[in-house]
């Protein structure tokens, strides 16, 4: 393998970013910092890794800082942390075999294994140091690195003609290397001249076959952990180079990690911690560090002091002091889960649910949601309310913040109905027993809510699959109404998305039938006789005959944008939808001097309209696109290679139009981006310039927000000389901070003169430049 170097700085900072304004064109993450899978202990710090980010605890001042892809990490999907004490280096391994080496805030990325074409899994399972070399236990074998420069010395492939062995962990004892694999233990002399030839390795006959997941050297013995998938249990064995035996002195449940230091061995279980001496006698135990129901220990490490560190999936980074039996918990504010299926934003608040209704089957994702309210995350674990609901909630797949009351959030469950959550009251579960939601006629006892949304009057609309009346509406006074979509949807159909447009029309998708139905109760929900309903023709006038509708959006011109499994379609005359058949059409764009339908080769997952009527479009594999108002021009394409975006799988997009921040929900977490358009105002009472003052080292965009729609702006100096001019995008002007000649203005005060489209309303704002 040929070594490549990429150096850059990793920036550490505390998570106070939610209260800080985000400059245009920059990102910030919204990740869980209480959900950790791997821990590494350094002399001055402790590191805890989640799926996408790392929390750093400073031992001296007890401060917390974070690293993610935004701050310089090269990848996402962290699998393992390891601190190489001999080189004062933190090693970060990713699930795709990418590697980062961090020393004194300088990062070296080594993508060699990631980029190599290799048979078998590339996952790096563990690390082992021996004689100035670092050995990586991988899915395909062992990679040997020189710890002086992290160059690859050699690679040992652990495969025979008929089988590939995954190496889970490696150690050395009595001048022999031992490896634990998914099918037994193997060994070879450390000076074996043909060590890269797996046929020269010998199986440890006494260990037999089986999946060995851990291997440690302890007090002259080998300690091996074996997992039996047939019963889902682990066993520990000891080998003293003569005898192989089961360690019956140690009892354990759900064994998660083993650590060895000196004459002590640490055992970490899901909710219990134990320390044993060289005779395997128990010398210290913690039966619970918080509450067994809410504990999920994943990794644990000795500190060399009286402290033990635990990475917990629920409680963050846990420190246990053995001398005083004291427990401390370290975490930062954030959502509960990396999974983000749907999000909603209102007035600077953000709600997210992790469940889904993919393929319209239950996945039994844990029922919870997270809510960023007044710049603080709140988490609702519905298992805490089981005594109220008498049901274990799962698959919360849709969420909506009440536009009339930001303290109130609703979430729909694919199987259990609708949850009403208030920040200062217990939640309420709605099902057929206390609402007009209906049980499925196909799946006994289940209530399938696929999507929810509020109309302009504060009424909540939702889809209800597999029943006679697939649309329900709840008023603020808790009066319920349900609606039939006959004759277009009859019987037990899946109804998924619902959009309430500016005309109060309801657009409803039936994905398995490839139907889009438009419906109006005509303002009289209790009188079905005046209801109107029609079917939309999706394919007759379209260039691409699609089979599945995935999402809906209304733009500022009232046009209906439709996301499908093969690109985007638009209904240009939706005002006629209830009086005549309307047709969906593709958008034709120019590509390499030819014509092509907009994103016709992409599965569209989300469409959101910004304050300038541009469209943010999410896809399942290609990231996110910013498209011009009419859809004919690609303005920006964000993906995991050209941006900090965590994943190319975009599940949802929502915009906080008060500041132009765009939130992307992905399968690996939420990330936001400050766009160039924000909500237009009706006057100039709330104009704000950011940043202000503009410091000498600032190179980013200067934004003037709070403007009236499409304001014309002129920037002049104190003498009245024109420096630059332009139009606002929605209610926001974006300026690169340079004059017409590309030069940064001199130190001084500059004035932004703004006027609306009529020229009747005007405003003046000031900017201070420091050069």
Language-model segment annotations:
Residues 10, 14-15, 682-714, 732-735:
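Glycine-centered coil/turn sites that cap beta-strands in beta-rich domains
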Residues 22-42, 68-86, 111-130, 154-173, ...:
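Short coil-to-beta transitions that initiate beta-strands within beta-rich domains
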Residues 45-48, 89-92, 133-136, 176-179, ...:
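Conserved beta-propeller blade signature
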Residues 53-55, 97-99, 141-143, 184-186, ...:
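Short glycine/acidic-enriched loop and turn motifs that connect beta-strands
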Residues 649-680:
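Blade-level signature of beta-propeller repeat domains, shared across WD40, Kelch, NHL, RCC1
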Residues 712-723, 750:
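Short, glycine-anchored, charge-dense loop/turn motifs used at functional sites
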């Amino acid at each position: 393998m040929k070594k490549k170097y990429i150096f850059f700085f990793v920036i550490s900072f505390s998570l106070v970013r939610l209260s800080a304004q985000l400059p245009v064109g920059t990102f910030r993450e919204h990740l869980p910092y209480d959900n950790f899978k791997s821990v590494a202990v350094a002399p001055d710090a402790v590191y805890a890794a989640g799926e996408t980010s790392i929390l750093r605890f400073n031992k001296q001042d007890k401060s917390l800082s974070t690293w993610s892809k935004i701050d310089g990490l090269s990848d996402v999907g962290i699998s393992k942390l390891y601190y190489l004490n001999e080189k004062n280096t933190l090693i970060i391994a990713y699930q795709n075999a990418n590697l980062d080496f961090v020393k004194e805030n300088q990062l070296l990325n080594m993508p060699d294994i990631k980029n190599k074409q290799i048979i078998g899994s590339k996952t790096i399972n563990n690390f082992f140091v021996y004689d100035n070399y670092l050995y990586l236990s991988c899915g395909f074998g062992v990679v040997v690195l020189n710890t002086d420069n992290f160059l690859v010395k050699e690679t040992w492939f652990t495969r025979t003609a008929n089988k590939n062995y995954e190496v889970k962990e490696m150690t050395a004892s009595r001048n022999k290397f031992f490896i634990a694999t998914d099918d037994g233990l193997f060994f070879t002399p450390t000076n074996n001249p043909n060590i890269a030839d797996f046929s020269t390795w010998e199986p440890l006959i006494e260990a037999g076959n089986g999946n060995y997941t851990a291997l440690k050297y302890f007090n002259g013995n080998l300690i091996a952990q074996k997992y039996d998938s047939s019963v889902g249990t682990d066993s520990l064995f000891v080998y003293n180079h003569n005898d192989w035996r089961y360690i019956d002195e140690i009892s354990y449940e759900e064994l998660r990690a083993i650590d060895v230091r000196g004459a002590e061995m640490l055992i970490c279980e899901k909710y219990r911690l134990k320390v044993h001496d060289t005779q395997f006698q128990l010398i210290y135990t913690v039966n619970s560090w918080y509450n067994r129901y809410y504990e999920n220990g994943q990794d644990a490490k000795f500190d060399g002091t009286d402290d033990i560190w635990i990475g917990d999936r629920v409680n963050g980074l846990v420190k246990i002091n053995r001398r005083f039996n004291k427990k401390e918990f370290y975490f930062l504010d954030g959502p509960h889960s990396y999974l983000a299926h749907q999000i909603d934003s209102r007035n600077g608040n953000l709600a997210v649910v992790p469940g889904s209704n993919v393929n319209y089957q239950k996945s039994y994702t844990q029922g919870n949601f997270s809510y960023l309210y007044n710049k603080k995350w709140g988490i609702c674990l519905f298992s805490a309310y089981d005594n109220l609901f008498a049901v274990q909630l799962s698959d919360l797949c849709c969420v909506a913040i009440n536009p009339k009351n930001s303290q109130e959030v609703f979430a729909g469950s694919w199987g259990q109905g609708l949850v009403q959550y208030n920040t200062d009251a217990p939640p309420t579960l709605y099902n057929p027993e206390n609402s007009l939601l209906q049980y499925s006629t196909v799946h006994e006892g289940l209530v399938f809510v696929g999507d929810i949304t509020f109309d302009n009057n504060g009424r909540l609309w939702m889809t209800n699959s597999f029943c006679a009346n697939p649309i329900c509406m709840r008023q603020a006074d808790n009066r319920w109404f349900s609606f039939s979509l006959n004759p277009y949807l009859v019987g037990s159909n899946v109804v998924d998305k619902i959009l309430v447009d500016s005309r109060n029309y309801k657009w409803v998708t039936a994905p398995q039938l490839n139907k889009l139905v438009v419906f109006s109760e005509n303002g009289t929900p209790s009188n079905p006789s005046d209801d109107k309903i029609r079917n939309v023709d999706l394919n007759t006038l379209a260039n691409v005959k699609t089979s599945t509708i995935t999402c809906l959006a209304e733009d500022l011109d009232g046009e209906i944008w439709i996301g499908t499994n093969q690109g985007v379609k638009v209904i240009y005359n939706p005002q006629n939808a209830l009086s005549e058949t309307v047709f969906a059409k593709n958008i034709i764009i120019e590509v390499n001097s030819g014509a092509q339908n907009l994103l016709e080769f992409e599965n569209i997952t989300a469409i959101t309209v910004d304050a300038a009527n541009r469209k943010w479009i999410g896809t399942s594999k290609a990231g996110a696109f910013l498209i011009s108002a009419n859809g004919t021009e690609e303005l920006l394409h964000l993906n995991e290679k050209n941006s900090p975006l965590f994943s190319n799988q975009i599940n949802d997009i929502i915009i906080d139009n008060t500041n132009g921040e765009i939130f992307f929900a992905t399968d690996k977490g939420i990330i936001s981006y400050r766009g160039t358009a924000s909500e237009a105002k009706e006057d100039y009472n709330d104009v704000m310039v950011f940043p202000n003052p503009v410091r000498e080292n600032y190179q980013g965009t200067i934004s003037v927000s709070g403007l009236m729609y499409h304001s014309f702006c002129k920037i002049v100096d104190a003498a009245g000389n024109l420096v630059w001019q332009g139009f606002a995008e929605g209610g926001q002007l974006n300026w690169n901070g340079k004059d017409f000649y590309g030069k940064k203005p001199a130190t001084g005060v500059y004035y932004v003169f703004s006027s609306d489209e009529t020229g009747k309303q005007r405003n003046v704002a000031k900017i201070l430049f420091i050069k």
